[in-house]
């Protein structure tokens, strides 16, 4: 093979490899607009998973003036976690522990445009669209969150991905519905009846 043919083959192979590596990090596949909730009393560890964004984005945990999770309208209270270009993939931040069922609201600040986008309901965002996918149990006991940083999309959620331990998307404190309780009660009554029938008569 001539050197020019060899060089051409190498360049062609490199070009084919580019699309495969453009998203060489996890992107949450489900959970558009879901909330991130505390699932246990253990510390919540955030891990930076990667991005393919051209814009520079900062990730914050929203806190109120007392340092508790929440949105009091003052972003200077928020805890900086990662920057999608400055943080190393795999880096971690311990966010501490919180009461089970507490919503952790995350804010993505887009440095290039000044927009802020949030986890949870679409109504929190300036364009009225959900800007985060939240995938519970992406890994065992770990939730994956992926953000979109552009106003009005394209909603490929590849602009900053991060994961958290000890978090869920359904409230662990949620009381079962009355129908579920009734079904459970009938099951217990049925088991008690079967047990009585099996007991020998005296």
Specify the residue positions occupied by each region the protein language model found.
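A recurrent domain-boundary module in secreted/ectodomain proteins
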Residues: 150-174
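Sec/Tat signal peptide C-region and signal peptidase I cleavage site
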Residues: 18-24
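Extracellular distal adhesion/interaction modules in secreted or cell-surface proteins
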Residues: 25-146, 150, 167-170
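A short, hydrophobic C-terminal helix/tail in secreted or cell-surface proteins
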Residues: 176-194
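C-terminal membrane-anchoring or membrane-association module
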Residues: 192-202
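Bacterial N-terminal signal peptides that target proteins for export
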Residues: 1-8
